[in-house]
UniProtKB/Swiss-Prot annotation:
InterPro entries: P-loop_NTPase, T2SS/T4SS_dom, T2SS_GspE_N. This is Protein transport protein HofB homolog. ATP binds at residues 222-229. It holds the Pfam family MshEN. The gene is hofB. The keyword Transport applies. Belongs to the GSP E family. PROSITE patterns: T2SP_E (PS00662). It comes from Escherichia coli (strain K12).
Amino acid sequence: MNIPQLTALCLRYHGVLLDASEEVVHVAVVDAPSHELLDALHFATTKRIEITCWTRQQMEGHASRTQQTLPVAVQEKHQPKAELLTRTLQSALEQRASDIHIEPADNAYRIRLRIDGVLHPLPDVSPDAGVALTARLKVLGNLDIAEHRLPQDGQFTVELAGNAVSFRIATLPCRGGEKVVLRLLQQVGQALDVNTLGMQPLQLADFAHALQQPQGLVLVTGPTGSGKTVTLYSALQKLNTADINICSVEDPVEIPIAGLNQTQIHPRAGLTFQGVLRALLRQDPDVIMIGEIRDGETAEIAIKAAQTGHLVLSTLHTNSTCETLVRLQQMGVARWMLSSALTLVIAQRLVRKLCPHCRRQQGEPIHIPDNVWPSPLPHWQAPGCVHCYHGFYGRTALFEVLPITPVIRQLISANTDVESLETHARQAGMRTLFENGCLAVEQGLTTFEELIRVLGMPHGE
């Protein structure tokens, strides 16, 4: 193990690497070394371990003297295996990937990039290179490099091409080795503006109206990777003024924003969503953002906060706006509580955008049942070009927005079923996700095939 890896290992267990020669590794700790540090060092190196005990003041003095810089992805650029990490991370950035998959396979490691929601392969690498790549990533993420049997999660920031880039790392034991997934976290410089989310004018007006209310619950729903986080952060940015106290509880904090009080949960330390929420309510908040409502206890705290003078924003994993009511009921939340707290529900998905440089209309238009969409849809194709490579470039969001009007509130209280509730909402002007998808196809933003890939056909069609 090289010096940067040993340095990171010592820092993980609250030590400082003083020196590493061919025979001895010299480490400083406060008071006495932990068993975890000694075990990790003995696993990582066969050299003799020498421990120097410092006072806490000495350790703090060393930390203040040490220049705090971001680690580069790879120091040993002359080594092909080390260069692999830099090439992989750089490729992900250049191709706008959201995730990097590193997977053990038979006689090789497979590397794939998720670009605009679809996985694209990079060249396979040898097992030795794959193992070395995994080990380096675990060191960067402050994971236990000696643990191969249990999943681990972490986060790290590296310097690539002169810029700080943050990643979330998750490992999973698999047949043949450990699978690693890296998620590229949103950068602080990203524009967060509700006006650029892609909502239709009426949807945007309903969203803005809900954010202007002094209290209530606003929910954003959809599967993982559907853009909920950006929608929530854009709403928080709109509300982020000097006269409003905004507090959030997240897992993890994906986009640090100046002016917000953002707390990351730490279940192993006893810092849970429920515990942080109870503490937040004693912090005189005006707006509370909950990264995700995962259980009935969190849902109940959120709803009570929304009923007592707080604007609460959160997310759920449901397929549509109306199905959100069923999901919360399954968590044990009574309908009367929902009807009094809810102000707006947003469902959303991301679809790939057609490349404007190579898109073409092909053949006959696409006919679908009139009760789904009243007119034929254009048949778009994009073969790919030097601008996009795959026919698509970027993604756009489709939204379904359900404002909780007095009529909808009464229907919720009366335990109206989901189908009837959706019928009333559509009669009042709500467009479903699929209808907004058809509108996007008409406008040439995406293809009908992409719409079906993401949403499928409506039930019964």
